[in-house]
Amino acid sequence: MTTRKDMQSKRHAEIVGGGFAGLAAAGALAQKGWSVRLHERSPELRPTGAGIYIYENGLRVLEKLGAYDEAVKGAPFAHTREMRDEQNRVLSVHRWDPSKRVFSVVRQRVINAMADEARKNGVEIVLGSEAVAATPDGELIMADGRRLKADLVVAGDGINSKIRDSLNLIAKRRPLPDGAVRIMIDRTPQERAASDGGTTIENWSGSRRILYTPVSDTEVYIALTMLHSDEVGRRVPIERASWKQSFPHLSDLIDRFVDNGQYGRFEYIRLKSWSAGRVAILGDAAHALPPNIGQGAGCSMMNALSLAWYLDREKDMATALRTWETNERPMTEHTQRISVFLGLPTTWPTPMRRAFLTLAGKSKWMVAQRTKTARHIPTGT
């Protein structure tokens, strides 16, 4: 519990959002001696989505936060990514550099690990607590009318951030042509016997994709990706018959799909600035991107950790926030560009898309661009 005495003797942060960005910022600031209170509007910490890839860059952040061991416990060490067409022919194979770690994990496990470490460092996590706006002088305005004063307000409240919008920070917000339904299913004994869980398979058929990713010894993460205009494809509960028509060789897998998925359309967001006065914006609220290289959470955690690092080195808030954005934003925007670019084939004719995917898997330049973020050493690690 953060006491009034703590707030008076330490620099104090009010953080909005209990996802990757908010929890990473909370843990990192607490490690630097801040008093921290985190607000999550939901009654529990439950992330959107089901599974997630965490690459070397994100794993370094988790290590720094003390959450690494618990976050990746039981998760497969990912080593191979295949792309296949509607006839199950392999279009490309990418084998990750074994010296750079990649884990496919259950999102909830990572969130729980980060929250546990944040609490150990003194962070107060308040559930069912909704913030609706902030002021540049560091005041957080709550849905119940309270106004909470802080040295720093951090907005990690997602793509529809009320804090960001209250400060008029959006430069560009663009819905993308595709989206995804994400679910978790049980991993069968046959699947467990046939594979170590380290191979991810992305199956393409027209503009539809089925991503198959083991995330534990007993669970598989499935992402169904389709054009937003594909009303049948994005329907929840999932229209199994329609997906079987697209992927007949995956009929047995599709029969195992559960009905509790959620559809989300991908978006791109770019801000005028990552901060306004004493308010910093993190995660999807600042730089939403499609998941085509699996770095949404990675960028969020890197930027959260580096925010605490710059604030610790430079006591002047304005200078610290300006330096943070100047140094960290280029890598994030590279990640956004390459993620959007790799989503373009979704709208292309099948022959053109097949040729691109085959070429992209062989191009050293393309591989270097898509792995640049994963190979980046996060500031503060």
Summary of predicted features, one role per range:
Residues 161, 180-182, 208-211, 286-287:
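Histidine-centered metal-chelating micro-motifs
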Residues 198-232:
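Active-site substrate-recognition segment that forms the wall
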